[in-house]
Amino acid sequence: MRRILPDSLSLRRVAGAVLAVVAIVVVFLVVDLGPTTVAKMAWRRAQKVADARNRWVTAHESGKLAAPTPADAARGFSVFTRSTLLRVGDRDAPRQGEVPAALHVQAAWNQYEAAQLAVHAWKAVDGLAIAATSLTDASGHEIPASAVDLRMERFYAIALSIHVHNRFGVVPKTLEPAVPVAAAAGTTRPFWITVHVPDGQAAGRYHGTVSIRAGDQAVDVPLDVDVLGLALDEAPMLLGPLSLPVLRNYTRAGPRRATKIAERAGVAFHDIREHGMTTLSLWSAHTLRRDAGGALVLPDLDVAMQLFGRERFPKPLLYAPVNLLSTNKLGRAATYRHYDSSVAVPLAREIATTYGARAAALGLPGLILDPIEEPNYALGLDRHDAPDLRQKIATELLAAMKQAGATTAMTCTPETALVGKGNLDYWLVAYKRFTPGVFEKARKAGAHLAMYANATLTGNGTSFSRFFFGYWPWATGLEGMTAWTWPMTPKRFPANLDPARAEGALDVHDGFLGRDDRPVPTIQWELAREGVDDMRYLATIARLAARARSSGDAGAVRAADEADAFLASVKAAVVRDPHRYTFEDPKTLAPRKAFGWDWTDFEARRRSSFELLAKLSAFAG
């Protein structure tokens, strides 16, 4: 007993000392970071431990599988089609209704319309390749084969959801130019096919072929394209990525590197416009210059304005001079320690006056200034600063810019939007904090209401990306939809978290370019374009219906009535609460109907839109 008792006391003393140290650390963290942050850290750690056994999720197919035909078995592979809103897994076999494969798309002038084709290997095959022919109509008009973009989907091991912690899976993510690849037995290779209808293309149905080949085996899949003989209207609101950093280092670079940076920025601007976006938000450089007369020069903004005008964006350019004003929130509060009101406020005024006039002189649609990144109440400048210090900065900068004649914007919550005090024109409200009541709050404040929903572009959903860049903002009367950020920026390009589980990139250089020297898109980026086109169809229908009705012709009025009823039905099918729309199980990514919407509803409404425009175009004159 004499030996045991001291040992027990020693253990108690050690345990007490450990607990004391832990308590001291916890107290220090609470004082340094705040109780809310510490509680969140503890909760995340608990989730990691609890979810350790459920980290990797395998998606299971739904629907009855289609047995391979004798020809498929002899060939060694089957070819099938699937909606672009439904993922093709790396081992998915064709389901009933997906074979025999046939592709059919509908598009207006200068529209890009996508379809999805996949190959399931019953046995190992080498040199699996895809090719497309030109398309012709009954009168001999042709859409060249070069207008059919063929890309292979690449599989990545990635986090499945921003809502459910610690869930990972293997999903198709990027779209690289298609090259011959091998396919092991039991695996599947999906392909993304985008048809671009040239301006002025004769209306009608065009026929062509997409061929899948492996060695001496081949399958020819019919490709039909219905062309609408008109161009879609531009989307009627601000649509585009936020905080694009492509010119951030431009002012610090030497001549050769600066030229390269500007070229890469041009690639980004072109791709964003090509995807139907109406604007973008540029994240500023860190330094400014003065000309010989002392006038303000922002080289990054000068380049951006030139590119913006070249690409003919139809809405104002957003510029966030947060690096110049020391108001960005990277590194949390660190940058605000350099904020100097005596410097930032006059600079904010000067940016507004100088570059507002320059935008007008260049014939741009306008310039919107966003002087500070989301001044939420959870973060102050330092642990000893007043919690509203960032809000006071926002108030004084917005006032300075507005007094100088600027149009202003700010990423915000419904609460922090109030710091604008009448000087905030565009509320860019975070999706997580967006509620139906925000519409009325913005109206009372006399502000334009927009949302930023980052998961639309940098998440891993499908229908979510399309819905929130299309039907939802149009039906709710929103005036802008944005997201952080362009998903192909080199630092944000998708990362394959487990090369043993997924293949990742095949041929990507400079961090975001494919073998064709074009940006390698993500599936979400392509689906956002589909959403923009949904909106453009609706806007064009509304305009042509009004014109048809004003003509007084009985047939035109009937067509206008049908169009108006369709538009009303779309609005009635959408509710203002964005959080009702979870199109997938967040734990497994299995698709599910979201408040009356699934992939079949998207496709049915697009078909109706196309048919209505074809009918209305007869009365367009």
Language model features by range: what are they?
Residues 425-503:
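Catalytic-core region of carbohydrate-active enzymes that cleave or remodel glycosidic bonds
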